């Protein structure tokens, strides 16, 4: 998603593909011989090849891969209708999977494609491994600019003096691979200096005593040995976060697959947010709301699951009478 800076290059690249291309009949893969085709011809060509493969090898011989907004139809619905259980989103395992699993464990729901951060009302933002302005979505960069305009203080944890670091009031050049140690030390300070949101934690969380016991020895002095960030700086940032709670936030980034401990690292990051009491509050994480829509008369779907492992729509697969979805399903 490095479109923030590269989009202009892609738009005007002389080699940008603007129309469908089909390999010239008789040429071999690797020769680079293609001809321009219309969209209708290209789609018909793909459909014809898919039908030929299914006829010869069966529907399972085709795998479907998708990514991003709108891929539901391509990764979920189409494979089920086609009859292939082979569908996946491989990019997720390289990007957001750790944060989605961590969020499910900590918050009880995934983060989702667009990070639900209330940038506009945040007053203290800590970016850890978050290369905003370099490899994030344009809309997120716009939100970040709005936060700066509204006077938010920014801390950037990054071995490089990044684009975001140039906008920060603190830059913490951490030793690569030690982010979890820093997060654990922040948790230690928030708890043992009695800086966390006690009412919020008591009302909305479980397991606090276990977390407190777990981080007992993860002091800033311990973290300094691993991160090469001075213990006093670690303490100061934790205290500044606490002073701005609940409008202090550590946004979970994309591209989370780093060192193998990624899910646990993101869990530690989310624990800091919980201790700041910012989940579901202005300046922190907002909870996306879905409006309730009255029942609409739709014709039954006759399509049954087409193959083992597929969960295609079914004529008998419908919500019970009177069912109302939760407003916060997001």
Give residue spans per PLM region.
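Conserved short loop/turn motifs at secondary-structure junctions
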Residues: 61-70, 225-229, 253-260, 292-293
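Intrinsically disordered or highly flexible coil/loop and linker segments, enriched in small
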Residues: 55-59, 87, 192-196, 220-224, ...
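Short linear loop/turn motifs
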Residues: 92-95, 205, 238-241, 287-290
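A glycine-rich, hydrophobic/aromatic-adjacent loop/helix-cap motif
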Residues: 241-330
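N-terminal export/assembly segments and adjacent metallocofactor-ligating motifs
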Residues: 2-195, 222, 230
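P-loop NTPase catalytic nucleotide-binding module
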Residues: 177, 181-247
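An alpha-helix initiation/capping motif
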Residues: 68, 72-73, 205, 209, ...
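Generic alpha-helical structural context detector
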Residues: 80, 184, 188, 239, ...
């Amino acid at each position: 998603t490095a479109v923030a800076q590269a989009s202009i290059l892609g738009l005007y690249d002389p080699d940008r593909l603007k129309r469908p291309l089909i390999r010239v009949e008789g040429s071999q893969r690797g020769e680079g011989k293609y001809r321009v085709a219309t969209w209708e011809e290209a789609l018909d060509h793909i459909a014809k090849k898919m039908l030929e493969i299914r006829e010869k090898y069966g529907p399972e011989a085709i795998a479907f891969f998708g990514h991003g907004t709108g891929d539901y139809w391509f990764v979920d619905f189409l494979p089920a209708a086609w009859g292939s259980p082979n569908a996946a989103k491989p990019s997720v395992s390289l990007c957001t999977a750790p944060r989605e699993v961590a969020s499910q464990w900590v918050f009880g729901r995934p983060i989702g494609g667009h990070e639900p951060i209330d940038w506009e009302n945040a007053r203290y933002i800590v970016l850890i491994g978050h290369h905003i302005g370099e490899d994030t979505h344009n809309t997120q960069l716009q939100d970040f600019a709005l936060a700066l305009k509204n006077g938010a203080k920014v801390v950037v944890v990054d071995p490089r003096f990044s684009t975001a670091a140039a906008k920060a009031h603190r830059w913490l050049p951490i030793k690569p691979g030690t982010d979890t140690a820093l997060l654990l030390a922040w948790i230690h300070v928030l708890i043992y200096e009695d800086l966390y949101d006690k009412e919020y934690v008591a009302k909305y969380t479980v397991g606090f005593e276990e977390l407190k016991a777990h981080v007992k020895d993860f002091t800033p002095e311990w973290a300094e040995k691993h991160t090469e960030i001075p213990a006093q700086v670690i303490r100061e940032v934790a205290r500044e976060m606490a002073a701005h709670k609940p409008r202090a936030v550590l946004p979970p980034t994309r591209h989370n697959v780093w060192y193998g401990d990624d899910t646990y690292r993101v869990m530690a990051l989310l624990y800091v947010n919980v201790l700041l009491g910012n989940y579901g509050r202005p300046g922190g994480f907002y909870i996306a709301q879905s409006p309730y829509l009255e029942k609409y008369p739709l014709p039954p779907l006759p399509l049954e699951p087409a193959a083992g492992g597929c969960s295609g729509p079914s004529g008998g697969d419908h919500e019970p009478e009177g069912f109302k979805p939760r407003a916060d399903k997001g």
